[in-house]
Amino acid sequence: MKREMKAPTTPLESLQGDLKGKQGRTSGPARRSTKGQWTPEEDEVLCKAVERFQGKNWKKIAECFKDRTDVQCLHRWQKVLNPELVKGPWSKEEDNTIIDLVEKYGPKKWSTISQHLPGRIGKQCRERWHNHLNPGINKNAWTQEEELTLIRAHQIYGNKWAELMKFLPGRSDNSIKNHWNSSVKKKLDSYYASGLLDQCQSSPLIALQNKSIASSSSWMHSNGDEGSSRPGVDAEESECSQASTVFSQSTNDLQDEVQRGNEEYYMPEFHSGTEQQISNAASHAEPYYPSFKDVKIVVPEISCETECSKKFQNLNCSHELRTTTATEDQLPGVSNDAKQDRGLELLTHNMDNGGKNQALQQDFQSSVRLSDQPFLSNSDTDPEAQTLITDEECCRVLFPDNMKDSSTSSGEQGRNMVDPQNGKGSLCSQAAETHAHETGKVPALPWHPSSSEGLAGHNCVPLLDSDLKDSLLPRNDSNAPIQGCRLFGATELECKTDTNDGFIDTYGHVTSHGNDDNGGFPEQQGLSYIPKDSLKLVPLNSFSSPSRVNKIYFPIDDKPAEKDKGALCYEPPRFPSADIPFFSCDLVPSNSDLRQEYSPFGIRQLMISSMNCTTPLRLWDSPCHDRSPDVMLNDTAKSFSGAPSILKKRHRDLLSPVLDRRKDKKLKRAATSSLANDFSRLDVMLDEGDDCMTSRPSESPEDKNICASPSIARDNRNCASARLYQEMIPIDEEPKETLESGGVTSMQNENGCNDGGASAKNVSPSLSLHIIWYQL
């Protein structure tokens, strides 16, 4: 019967042991053994194993046991069996050593700290610090409020002392556990009877992170050392008990569980260290105020057709300015003082000269970005910042006389830039004032009005073109500088008054034409020829360099042709012997006679005839035009870029003395054909001369012999012509080239070439002119 009674009890005991182990340890790695107390035999085996392995390899030590782990063996040795273990009260010297080492290593390196305290382990040092030596510990007597909070928190979390620490700042888990077991548990009935708990139920239970227990402000810098520690290396990782493990997790990984309610928060009294830590934690919970650069003002964009149809009749209606940020549509928590400091007050109200608030009276096509500060380009601002302006504003800067913009430089511009007489204002942003408020320096603006109420840093957005008809009328102001505007610190665009048309050269200067009698303002013509579709936003940086000024094009196809207004003269002259045109720099009207006054390359007098001729003259060509048709055709084909390619020769380089010799040879080859024709005409003239000689009354015997033999005379003429041609051919020219040219050969006649000298005197004057020119 005894055996039968013992048989069923064995599984129950093992089941109870398993349940006990599972209930006692809810986290961490699974244990291989759930065996309870150590027997004296196991303690003796453990001591021998530690002596054998010198207390280093605990895995080898655990192999000496059947159901023990390395952690169990380590804890048994360190806490119980180690003969060097010091148990009992802490001395004053030990407490001072722990305080110094915590300030040096931080409240995490307990194994390192325990090495400086012989006989003490890391667990003992940690518990001594958190329960007694930590300056953030509240050692005062428990108050009634703290006890009521402990009761309410214990109703929710039970015996989880680490969780209860969050509601009781300054109290450690050990002190909370001791006070609960010793005092509060006995007072529960009295608290329920008095009704104090019912009164506290209405207020929310606030969990405050008990940072003062886990760390102190003097060694918060050493928290990063925890990442270097690994499980199993430090002694405290293996020597912590169940309660200390939960405590370490609760003190290291604390979270804020704040439940917001309508009542006031529970803020108990703290010590100096605790107040400093909580104030640091509360500083991160302040509301976020977006910076001024994140704010953007968006102005509704209205097409030009709508503006022209309305004709600004509804000028008194106010328009909304939608203030947006990167993520929200409003600025949360921004006070009126902040708005006044940031300059937002000017964006919502436009102040006139009398100081009265008026609503915005104008719809704009542009958008203002407050993040882009419209300061000088050489200032210490963002180089990528851009200010958006319209094409019409660009025209006012590039062609100030054509735009008749005198109001922008008048002394009354102040806050209302365009036409202050009609009360039409423009949206101004006090960017310079904001910059001066932040940096303490007033930036120098490139726009300097003469009046006392200058711009003062206002960045004015231009109005639409339809409003410019009323606002851009010239006004006679004695104090108004006509040419005193610059383009936001870009390259200076000097406005000059000249007799030429408005023209932009590559150096960034603006040349404008107009009558000096009218004060620099020409007749009223405006920019009516510019289509309204071209009024688009362009970045201001496109006018910041002189090289970009030439890239601005305005459609001028629809501009009506006007007589006696003049135009840009573009007749590109050409270099000699090359088909390379260059741009004419004529800045005067084509019908004027002032082209002689301007010569960019110094060859105006030389090249002036080429502009009026269909074929440009060469520098070495003869003034006579009796050349062969082939030569004239080739020269004409080379001068026209649209001629067929079959008539063109290969393009030569620019003028070169070496290449000109090839050109001279070709000219001489072509001239020999015309010379042969002249020789044929010479034969006719000589024949006529022979007839005249035969008709003379007195004839010498020698002349009779010459006339008697016409064949001999013909040979003499050939010899004379050959001699003349030899004189015309250069010495360095080969006879082979002369043969190929088809001209007369240089072979002498056997029948007396010396007798042809008299025949050479009868050469015609035209032939003599050719001979003299070719010899040169």
UniProtKB/Swiss-Prot annotation:
One Pfam family hit: Myb_DNA-binding
Gene Ontology biological process terms in this record: negative regulation of cell population proliferation; negative regulation of cellular response to caffeine; negative regulation of DNA-templated transcription; positive regulation of DNA-templated transcription; regulation of cytokinesis
SMART domains in the record: SANT
Tissue specificity statement from the Swiss-Prot or TrEMBL entry: Expressed ubiquitously at low levels. Expressed in roots, cotyledons, flowers and leaves, especially in vascular tissues.
Assembly and binders: Component of a DREAM-like complex which modulates a variety of developmentally regulated genes and of the mitotic genes in proliferating and differentiated cells.
Species the sequence originates in: Arabidopsis thaliana (Mouse-ear cress)
Effect on the protein of changing D586N: In strain: cv. Landsberg erecta
Keyword set, alphabetical order: Activator, DNA-binding, Nucleus, Repeat, Repressor, Transcription, Transcription regulation
Annotated region of DNA binding: 58-81, 110-133, 161-184
Region annotation (Disordered) ranges: 1-41, 217-253, 364-384, 401-435
Localization (cell): Nucleus
Gene that this polypeptide is encoded by: MYB3R1
This protein's name: Transcription factor MYB3R-1
Recorded phenotype for the gene knockout or disruption: The double mutant myb3r1 myb3r4 often fails to complete cytokinesis, resulting in multinucleate cells with gapped walls and cell wall stubs in diverse tissues (e.g. in embryo during the first or second division after fertilization, in stomata guard mother cell) and several pleiotropic developmental defects, and associated with the selective reduction of several G2/M phase-specific genes transcript levels (e.g. CYCB2, CDC20.1 and KNOLLE). Hypersensitivity to caffeine, an inhibitor of cytokinesis.
UniProt biased composition (Polar residues): 240-253, 364-380, 423-432
GO cellular component: nucleus
